[in-house]
């Protein structure tokens, strides 16, 4: 009887998911979960409320999923999806996802019941504010979030609103000294928070939770996977790596040309000079100060 009960329970758990070409889909605690391997080391996680219909076309991801050899097994309420380089565990009772290397080293885990969907009215369209929390190690340094003006290297222990700004370019992405990266694929105003209790993303608008886990083993490997997802960044031409002259602004074309001439007169190499905001003028046409070339 005990053996039969165990068999039925295990069968019940097994029926909570089904295989897809890239991984599995499951519904746990009223949340649809889609775990899809884009490569042996890159996994996409999609979550949405059960019954919610939506279409998500990324504005950032251009990489196409590779055909990845996977093994899927279920034991003790834990569903395990493995490539030859990365292991993903799904708790079939709580929906918690954890990521580990192929040799079993823990990399990152979601918090238990760490996904949340709050109703949001987006200019008359029903959608959600979406939230996902993770647990990082106490002394785990992370880098990224874009080009910020906060003077920090590691982006731990802060709350940061990620929105494009005149002085800051934000990217909802970080990479860890443990050799993985996390890309939160959402373009609405987003709160990144890290404290002793959690590391989380909260986006104002989203039909789903959508993020990518990238395991590169080191920083270069993570960047390589991010390029695979979002495209190569072209190198600047050689001359841009030389000496540049910059100041708050120049008042006229005569002034800026005079500075260049003085550099030439002194024999000081100059590869670029920056004319900042004064050229804008009082309307959209720009070129307000006779930069006539």
Regions found by a protein language model. Name each.
Residues 16, 32-34, 71, 87-89, ...:
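Short, surface-exposed charged micro-motifs
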Residues 15-29:
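Short N-terminal segments immediately surrounding and downstream of signal-peptide cleavage
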Residues 1-16:
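Bacterial Sec-dependent N-terminal signal peptides
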Residues 240-242, 272:
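Structural preference for beta-strand elements that scaffold enzyme active sites
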Residues 57-84, 151, 159, 284-293:
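Aromatic/His-enriched, Gly/Pro-containing loop or helix-boundary segments
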Residues 74-238, 247-248, 253, 258-267:
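Catalytic and substrate-binding clefts that recognize carbohydrates or anionic sugar/phosphate headgroups
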Residues 269-293:
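Aromatic- and carboxylate-enriched substrate-binding clefts and catalytic-loop regions
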Residues 17, 21, 36-79, 116-120:
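A low-complexity, Ser/Thr/Gly/Pro-enriched, surface-exposed linker/loop concept
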């Amino acid at each position: 009887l005990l053996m039969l009960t165990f068999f039925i329970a295990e069968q019940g758990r097994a029926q909570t998911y089904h295989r897809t070409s890239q991984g599995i889909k499951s519904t746990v605690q009223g949340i649809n979960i889609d775990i899809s391997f884009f490569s042996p080391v890159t996994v996409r996680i999609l979550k949405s409320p059960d019954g919610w219909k939506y279409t998500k076309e990324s504005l950032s991801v251009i990489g196409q999923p590779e055909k990845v050899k996977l093994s899927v097994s279920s034991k003790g309420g834990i569903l395990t999806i493995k490539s030859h380089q990365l292991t993903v565990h799904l708790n079939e009772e709580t929906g918690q996802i954890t990521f580990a290397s192929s040799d079993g080293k823990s990399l990152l885990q979601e918090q238990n019941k760490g996904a949340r969907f709050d109703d949001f009215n987006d200019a008359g369209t029903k959608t959600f504010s979406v939230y996902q929390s993770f647990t990082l190690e106490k002394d785990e340094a992370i880098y990224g979030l874009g080009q910020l003006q906060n003077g920090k290297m590691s982006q731990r222990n802060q709350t940061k609103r990620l929105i494009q700004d005149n002085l800051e370019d934000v990217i909802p992405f970080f990479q860890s000294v443990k050799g993985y990266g996390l890309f939160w694929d959402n373009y609405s105003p987003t709160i990144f928070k890290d404290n002793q209790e959690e590391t989380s993303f909260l986006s104002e608008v989203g039909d789903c939770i959508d993020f990518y886990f990238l395991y590169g083993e080191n920083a270069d490997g993570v960047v390589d996977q991010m390029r695979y997802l979002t495209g190569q960044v072209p190198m600047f031409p050689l001359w841009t790596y030389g000496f540049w002259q910059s100041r708050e602004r120049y008042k006229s074309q005569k002034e800026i040309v005079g500075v260049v001439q003085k550099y030439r007169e002194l024999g000081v190499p100059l590869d670029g000079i920056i004319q900042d905001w004064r050229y804008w003028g009082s309307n959209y046409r720009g070129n307000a100060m006779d930069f006539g070339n």
